Design a protein with these regions (language model features):
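An acidic/histidine-cluster motif and surrounding catalytic segment
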Residues: 1-101, 112-156
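Extended, folded domain segments that form the structural surfaces/walls around functional sites
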Residues: 104
Length: 156
């Protein structure tokens, strides 16, 4: 099950179909994996607070992933995205908010499934998987030079 919680009006004001975009991207990233995921569309302040508490980084970011303990199955974990940060990234990178949100949800869910980008080899593998999933969703390659790329700070 994919649960979408929207705690920032910015998301639905800018993208009325935000919940549907999230659900579609999360399902695509899960593929055949069984389990529950919660995706929180939040304000940057909430993301900054979580980033400070769990990663000791006192700043907002685009997406945070919090994998659940194996004993919590079927809950796989939570993904949190900050509206203003994501919207600014999308604009800077010349992407629609819908496409950027799809990418960040796929990225976050892959972290819940154990994917990472701590070194170049892991990053290349994870990015290739993201490209494949996003292509199935009709979203352009987010890592193409003209599209920019998401910030890689490591998984949370």
């Amino acid at each position: 099950m994919i649960e979408v919680e929207i705690d920032s009006d910015g998301w639905t004001e800018a993208l009325p179909e935000a919940a549907a975009v999230v659900e579609r991207a999360a399902r695509a990233a899960l593929g055949t994996v069984e389990g529950d995921v919660v995706v929180l569309l939040a304000a940057d302040e909430a993301v900054q607070d979580l980033n400070q508490r769990f990663r000791d980084k006192d700043r907002p970011t685009n997406v945070l992933s919090f994998p659940a303990a194996e004993s919590a199955f079927p809950h796989l974990g939570d993904v949190v995205l900050g509206y203003a940060y994501c919207a600014a990234e999308a604009e800077t990178q010349g992407k629609t908010l819908s496409d950027h949100l799809s990418h960040l949800v796929v990225h976050g869910v892959l972290h819940l499934l154990g994917r990472d980008h701590e070194d170049d080899a892991e990053a290349e593998e994870m990015e290739a998987e993201e490209r494949e999933i996003l292509a199935e969703l009709g979203v352009s390659d987010p890592y193409a030079a003209e599209n920019g790329a998401i910030e890689h700070e490591g998984a949370a």
